[in-house]
A protein has these predicted regions:
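The feature captures the beta-strand-to-loop junction immediately N-terminal to the Walker
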Residues: 18-20
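ABC transporter nucleotide-binding domain
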Residues: 145-160, 164-231
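Conserved beta-strand
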Residues: 1-13, 39
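Helix N-cap at the start of a conserved alpha-helix in ABC-type nucleotide-binding domains
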Residues: 141-143
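Short, conserved post-Walker A segment of ABC-type ATPase nucleotide-binding domains
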Residues: 15, 26-35
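ABC-family P-loop ATPase nucleotide-binding domains
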Residues: 53, 60-117
């Protein structure tokens, strides 16, 4: 079990971590992973910072936690096997093939390929706890679907996924934790009906959000404009849909 100041993440479940940009999602994951010291966090009942018994059971991967640029894919497997007590070499090689990762230095991979390698590394580590910080960034549609498929295959491990795509991953999650001024957490079914995702031009999203006056749980810039998650649990959905339609949002 993982306990922080605001949340408790139960063992064996897949947890979504959502919140506005800059709220501290990555920092929280780094604290859980023992990379940053924090007095308010316990993992398996112990402080994770500089605690090898915890660090051997927890892995954090994401675009902000890159692997060394000079390492080739083969070396990653060698290092992983040396570092992680329960490293699964067969699973590592299997997923490299499934994600069609080229045998190149990490530095020469595309952003999506780096995301895939980080995810593969986390899965193959055999760690009981996987912390995935927006692990899908840069993945094309085909590999994104494969990513979700592999997550389903790993169900039963404790996973915390920081995401801007709550509606997209909702079917994989057991719980959601929302970071903010008033943090809340609970089963996914209690949240999903009241959390709405709006997409469209950035200026229209900003104007609509101000008019609605509802909390924005996260914002993300996309090639077509932006995406925002709105906490509408305390509001009627009809005015929201009318406002979204008026601003040309989806």
């Amino acid at each position: 079990m993982i306990k922080t100041r605001d949340f408790t993440f139960a063992d064996g479940l897949t947890h979504g971590l959502v919140g506005p940009n800059g709220i501290g999602k990555t920092t929280l994951l780094r604290q859980i992973a023992g990379q940053i010291q924090s007095g308010g966090i316990t993992v398996f009942g112990e402080q994770p910072f500089d605690n090898q018994s915890v660090l051997n059971r927890v892995i954090l991967m994401g675009i902000d936690n890159p692997l060394p640029d000079s390492w080739g894919i083969g070396k990653l497997g060698v290092i992983g096997k040396a570092r992680w007590p329960h490293w699964d070499d067969e699973r590592f090689n299997e997923l490299l093939v499934r994600f069609d990762v080229p045998a190149k230095a990490y530095s020469s991979l595309s952003r999506g390929q780096k995301s895939a390698v980080g995810f593969i590394f986390a899965v193959a580590s055999g760690c009981e706890v996987m912390l995935l910080d927006e692990p899908y960034l840069g993945l094309d549609t085909q590999r994104r679907e494969l990513f979700y498929q592999v997550l389903r295959e790993e169900h039963g491990r404790t996973m915390i996924i920081s995401t801007h795509h709550l509606n997209e991953v909702a079917g994989l999650l057991d719980t959601v934790s929302l970071m903010g001024d008033s943090p809340i957490s609970g089963p996914i079914d209690d949240f999903i009906e009241g959390i709405l995702e709006l997409t469209g031009p950035s200026e229209a999203l900003t104007a609509a959000a101000e008019e609605l006056g509802l909390p924005a749980l996260s914002r993300q810039t996309t090639p077509l404009g932006g995406r925002v998650l709105i906490d509408a649990r305390s509001a009627s959905t009809d005015p929201i849909f009318r406002t979204a339609q008026a601003y040309g949002l989806r």
